[in-house]
Amino acid sequence: MAGNMLANYVQVYVMLPLDVVSVDNKFEKGDEIRAQLKKLTEAGVDGVMIDVWWGLVEGKGPKAYDWSAYKQVFDLVHEAGLKLQAIMSFHQCGGNVGDVVNIPIPQWVRDVGATDPDIFYTNRGGTRNIEYLTLGVDDQPLFHGRTAVQMYADYMASFRENMKKFLDAGTIVDIEVGLGPAGEMRYPSYPQSQGWVFPGIGEFICYDKYLEADFKAAAAKAGHPEWELPDDAGEYNDTPEKTQFFKDNGTYLTEKGKFFLSWYSNKLIKHGDKILDEANKVFLGCRVQLAIKISGIHWWYRVPNHAAELTAGYYNLDDRDGYRTIARMLTRHHASMNFTCAEMRDSEQSEEAKSAPEELVQQVLSAGWREGLHVACENALGRYDATAYNTILRNARPKGINKNGPPEHKLFGFTYLRLSNELLEGQNYATFQTFVEKMHANLGHDPSVDPVAPLERSKPEMPIEMILKAAQPKLEPFPFDKNTDLPVKDHTDVGDEVLVAPV
């Protein structure tokens, strides 16, 4: 029976603090992290996830990598007997929800922007976003002779070379490739650093000269040289109906609007495809899984225009699946999809935001599973309460436990945001331990579950037309039960109050 039940086991990881390595690339919290890892091990956790910041490791100059601090952290993780998910963090820390520290991208890269500010994502008003390089420079050799994609590939190759010990030992099991702000495959359409507040629709971010030239060339090729980038899509904190682009029968439904949205979302898919191809070459043969993260943009999901998703680059409408296209691209690289907001309930959201996190999770997970992917999840906000854990448990096994073998569907893993002393104290720790136990189908910790095979080479390039076939028809998501069949009991005695903590 235990053998059959093991197929229901979902691995649990915990995200390490953003500043586990200091802003001057030193590891100074050895005793604190060692003690915290011990408590995670005692709770039965499978592993941890860590941001490996580009701005720290290659901060001193082109190819002047310094991995020493990360090697010290990885040694502690290895000693604790935990697995490790490493994020190739090519973005800035600072400017997004939960960012408590500021780690910019390398100064020598930003210096290129002093003479060519178009290396950064730009909104229609001309404001630059320095969190991540625009995908418009993916193939532009502007960085001491290298393109952006070459810089990312070289960084990953140096990581593989320097972390060979941990790759060979099976400590590092997952390489999550950062593809945009907050490490997510999206445009920086809702930057808090520029005044965006929830539930603003965000803005299209494609007005740097490189993306603008690309759009003009694409429009001319399509026989419409007169088409320009949108000028009617509003500003960060607008509601959809305030804009000509997103209102009922707005621009987004016209030939011109559809052309723009296809171009905008396809550029993002090609960006991910290109960088994953490099990652696959670098980690070929390693026992690791490649992964990307998709942002959980749950606001304005319940209106036909899905405005906030569209500005982020997810061309998702009621009759078009904007996530299955991404999933199909991932199949080429044997990569997995990591999604967020796994803890959210619709009932916790404000009515004005037209938010539907539960339906969004259902759609995205179903899209990944239909394409045969491993799908993982995270929580968006720090929570310690049974309600949140039970929502995660429901999403981890949507139709519950199967005592005779694999469940109909299950998450490949779940990563909890984020490690803190608060998580490891008193009732919070006790509830978290119970949650881990339930994710493990009450079987206790088992490191042999879901072993990772050596990474195979990416399949031949997939034409964008084949990828886009996944968008329509938009199929109904797989059914999800309302509640989990292995719930965490609520011991918090706070009634219906939701405990929310900063991540």
UniProtKB/Swiss-Prot annotation:
One of its GO terms (molecular function) is beta-amylase activity. It comes from Triticum aestivum. Its EC number is 3.2.1.2. It comes from the Eukaryota. InterPro entries: Glyco_hydro_14, Glyco_hydro_14_CS, Glyco_hydro_14B_pln, Glycoside_hydrolase_SF. The keyword Hydrolase applies. The lineage of its organism: Eukaryota, Viridiplantae, Streptophyta, Embryophyta, Tracheophyta. The keyword Iron-sulfur does not apply. Pfam families: Glyco_hydro_14. The active site is at E184 (proton donor), E378 (proton acceptor). GO terms for biological process: polysaccharide catabolic process. This is Beta-amylase Tri a 17. Optimum pH is 5. Highly active at acidic pH range 4-7. Retains over 80% of maximum activity at 4.0. At higher pH values the activity decreases markedly, with more than 50% of activity lost at pH 8.0. It catalyses: Hydrolysis of (1->4)-alpha-D-glucosidic linkages in polysaccharides so as to remove successive maltose units from the non-reducing ends of the chains. Belongs to the glycosyl hydrolase 14 family. Substrate binds at D51, H91, D99, K293, H298, T340, N379, A380, R418. Keywords: Allergen, Carbohydrate metabolism, Glycosidase, Hydrolase, Polysaccharide degradation.
